[in-house]
Amino acid sequence: MKHYLALIPNILSSLRLGLALIFPFSPEELWLWIIVVSGATDFLDGWCARRWKVSSWQGGLLDAVADKMFMIAALLTFVMAGKFAIWWIPAVIARDLTVAIAAGYAAIIRSWGSFHDMGARWSGKVATAGQFILLITVVLVPGMIPAALLITVSCSAVAAADYGLLFYQALRRQQADKKAVP
């Protein structure tokens, strides 16, 4: 039975990937529902994986890719619809950019373990929640976008700093471990 349970989180993440693909082509009337379903799958995939003890590195990667793809698809769709400024996007995804840069750096210096061992953080969960709140705000209350953007960017900046510090500490530990081995 556990084998089948292990599939559910990945199916939910895959559903979010599918939603990322259809979002740009969906009528505005469906945007809110697609965002809500995407947010629900984001919550449920991790919750199910932890609850049923079926977490995996590959599932975590699929979840992260699905999150980023959906967020970028939604934000670019809003830009194309004239509802969101393109120059706001880097600020909204600052945490994601930080993690991507850290992963690239880890790969270049062949120190993948320092990146691979970084798990989900509370700051990342708050930043993701802020991003989904921003998407809902764009659809439901466009006049509140500046306030939602400020909150989202603040959460994203805190998460970027948190992940950056964690990566730096992991690199330092790894370097210390290498020096300790004769």
Where do the protein language model's features map onto the residues?
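Membrane-embedded alpha-helical segments that form the functional core of polytopic membrane enzymes
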Residues: 11-60, 74-79, 83, 88-90, ...
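A feature for the membrane-embedded catalytic helix bundles of lipid/isoprenoid biosynthetic enzymes
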Residues: 2-6, 32-33, 64-182
